[in-house]
């Protein structure tokens, strides 16, 4: 197996499919009202913003969103980024892969997924110009029609359409239809009816729980315990307990907060019902991420006057005189310099940001110290380049039985404006199978080692073997060794196979109690603000939507501190079904009396 390259929010489409099963629980109380799209923020600059300088520390989705909102309001913004703009969301080139005037093969930390439950990020996308698109980058979103739970051990796969008006069913051959029905029937046989009924009851308990019960009880209850997985069948555990946690948010079902998992599931139920959605439950970009989104965003921000310092590493946020007095950063040559501004927005991932907070800064706001309790884990991508397109599902696939919790999507068919072999690589690769690895601490099937214990080459071979075990196990060969051109593993992962592997791009996870350690965007330090997917916002998940919403909240806090007359950023909350409010009010009354939810039978 040829490796390419040097010595990846995540997939939530499993929840979109799961929402189809859960829709029955929500349909009785859901309304068909849809929330209006978030309005674009006003671009009029604040009279007091002229000459006010803001240093944005980090150039991922959070940092670029903050820069966007601030620049529209007349602030002089400089973004400091250590590696490349876009952060974990960016796509990248495979070094040395271009031939004959083509572009390098496209790679990424992990494939992008922008579901209809997002509102703030799509609003920003609409405000980024893209040639020929009346709605800017937002028009580059496309919606796969189906997804699949790929089963191993000779089990037929579960292939499901993604419900949305205008979606037509995939054209299935008689054999594909037989296999799809076989997968459903095999699951029905193994998943007892009473267990399905119990799970739907638990869904109803969560949907009708008041906010207080969610925040104070379900936040401290592991999902595994909430759905009583230990008392259920292996099929129940695999699909309903583990399948919609580990493969979605890189969080173990035994530890994941019920509030987080339930909130995500609830959002997808109503998205599938067409309530309060920006679009279909599953959306992806119609080009590699930088081509479709990040590069146009950078160009637009530069047109607004934003300056970028690429290759600058933030070392320490200094504190003095009751304010942030400056930021020590290393320039591309390694020389330490002190950056000064009127305001500072920390938009680094939490595991990097908290290392930069000086002792004085932490003492000024104890909230920063609580961020040390936030946990991260590995979720990283690998891409396989194929010389023949594999006959896979036309959307995301979730290898639900795989040891390393693999999710994947074959990308070329979703990039209609690109002839893959004509545009990328050496002309022989025709597609990219992009895979996210969510489990790095369990033994694989090929070497009996964890992903962290494997070398880069062993990781690639192991992932390929696990994919084949899930896809080639029912008498068909969907992935062929002869069609494998090369592979590329996220360069943010280093030291694999050594005692001390590292990952520069870990993902925030959500064990019980996480909610209460999330900080607010505004701090007690008058010129210091936080932006990132770890900041407390309405969507309780490490997502690009959370990063975007937190940046808007940070900018609003900054505008308040400046007594600015500029319009505040719109921060659109998750959809709340009006039909559920009466049940939630009743549950609030019961909760305050110390009673269970009325649907909670234990």
Describe these PLM feature segments.
Residues 274-285, 328, 341-343, 348-518, ...:
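C-terminal segments that line or cap access tunnels to active or ligand-binding sites in enzymes
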Residues 318-338:
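Conserved beta-strand-loop-beta-strand element in the redox core of flavoprotein oxidoreductases
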Residues 71-95:
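Glycine-rich FAD pyrophosphate-binding loop
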Residues 99-198:
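Dinucleotide-binding Rossmann-like beta1-alpha1 core, especially the glycine-rich loop
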Residues 195-323:
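Active-site/ligand-binding neighborhood in enzyme catalytic cores
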Residues 52-78:
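N-terminal Rossmann-like FAD-binding beta1-loop-alpha1 element of flavoenzymes
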Residues 559-601:
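Active-site-proximal substrate-binding core of FAD-dependent oxidoreductases
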Residues 1-19:
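N-terminal secretory signal peptides and thylakoid transit peptides that target proteins
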């Amino acid at each position: 197996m040829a490796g390419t390259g040097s010595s990846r929010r995540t997939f939530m489409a499993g929840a979109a499919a799961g929402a189809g099963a859960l829709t029955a629980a929500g349909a009785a109380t859901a309304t068909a009202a849809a929330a209006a799209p978030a309005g674009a923020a006003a671009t009029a600059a604040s009279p007091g913003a002229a000459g006010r300088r803001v240093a944005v520390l980090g150039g991922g989705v959070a940092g670029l969103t903050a820069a966007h909102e601030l620049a529209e309001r007349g602030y002089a913004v400089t973004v400091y980024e250590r590696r490349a703009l876009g952060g974990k969301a960016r796509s990248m080139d495979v070094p040395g892969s271009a031939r004959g005037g083509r572009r390098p093969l496209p790679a990424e930390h992990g494939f992008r997924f922008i579901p209809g439950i997002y509102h703030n990020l799509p609003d920003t996308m609409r405000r980024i110009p893209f040639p020929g698109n009346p709605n800017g980058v937002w028009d580059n979103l496309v919606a796969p029609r189906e997804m699949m739970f790929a089963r191993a051990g000779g089990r037929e796969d579960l292939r499901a359409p993604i419900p949305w008006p205008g979606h037509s069913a995939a054209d299935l051959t008689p054999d594909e239809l037989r296999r799809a029905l076989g997968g459903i029937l095999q699951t029905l046989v193994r998943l007892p009816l009473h267990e399905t009924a119990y799970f739907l009851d638990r869904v109803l308990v969560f949907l009708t729980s008041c906010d207080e019960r969610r925040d104070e009880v379900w936040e401290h209850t592991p999902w595994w315990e909430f759905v009583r997985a230990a008392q259920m069948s292996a099929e129940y555990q695999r699909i309903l307990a583990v399948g919609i946690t580990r493969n979605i948010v890189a969080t173990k079902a035994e530890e994941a907060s019920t509030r987080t998992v339930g909130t995500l599931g609830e959002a997808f139920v109503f998205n599938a019902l067409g309530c309060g959605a920006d679009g279909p439950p599953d959306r992806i970009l119609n080009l590699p991420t930088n081509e479709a989104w990040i590069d146009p965003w950078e160009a637009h921000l530069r047109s607004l006057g934003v300056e970028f310092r690429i290759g600058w590493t933030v070392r320490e946020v200094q504190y003095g005189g009751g304010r942030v007095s400056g930021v020590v950063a290393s320039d591309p040559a390694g020389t330490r310099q002190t950056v000064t501004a009127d305001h500072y927005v920390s938009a680094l991932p939490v595991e990097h940001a908290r290392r930069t907070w000086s002792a004085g800064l932490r003492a000024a706001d104890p909230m920063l110290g609580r961020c040390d309790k936030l946990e991260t884990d590995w979720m990283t991508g690998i891409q396989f380049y194929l010389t023949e397109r594999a006959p896979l599902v036309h959307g995301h696939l979730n290898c639900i039985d795989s040891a390393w919790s693999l999710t994947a999507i074959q990308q070329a068919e979703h990039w209609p404006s690109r002839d893959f072999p004509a545009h990328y690589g050496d002309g022989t690769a025709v597609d990219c199978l992009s895979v996210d690895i969510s489990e790095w601490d369990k033994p694989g099937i090929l070497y009996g080692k964890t992903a962290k214990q494997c070398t880069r080459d062993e990781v690639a071979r192991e992932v390929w073997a696990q994919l084949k075990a899930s896809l080639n196990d029912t008498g068909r060969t969907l992935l062929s060794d002869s069609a494998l051109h090369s592979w590329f593993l996220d360069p943010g992962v280093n030291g694999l196979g050594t005692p001390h592997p590292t990952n520069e791009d870990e993902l925030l996870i959500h064990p019980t109690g996480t909610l209460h350690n999330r900080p607010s965007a505004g701090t007690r330090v008058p010129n210091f603000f936080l932006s990132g997917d770890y900041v407390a916002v309405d969507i309780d998940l490490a997502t690009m939507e959370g990063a975007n919403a937190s940046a808007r909240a940070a900018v609003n806090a900054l505008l308040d501190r400046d007594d600015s007359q500029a319009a505040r950023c719109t921060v659109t909350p998750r959809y709340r079904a009006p039909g559920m409010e009466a049940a939630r009010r009743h549950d609030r009354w019961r909760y305050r009396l110390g009673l269970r939810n009325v649907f909670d039978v234990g």
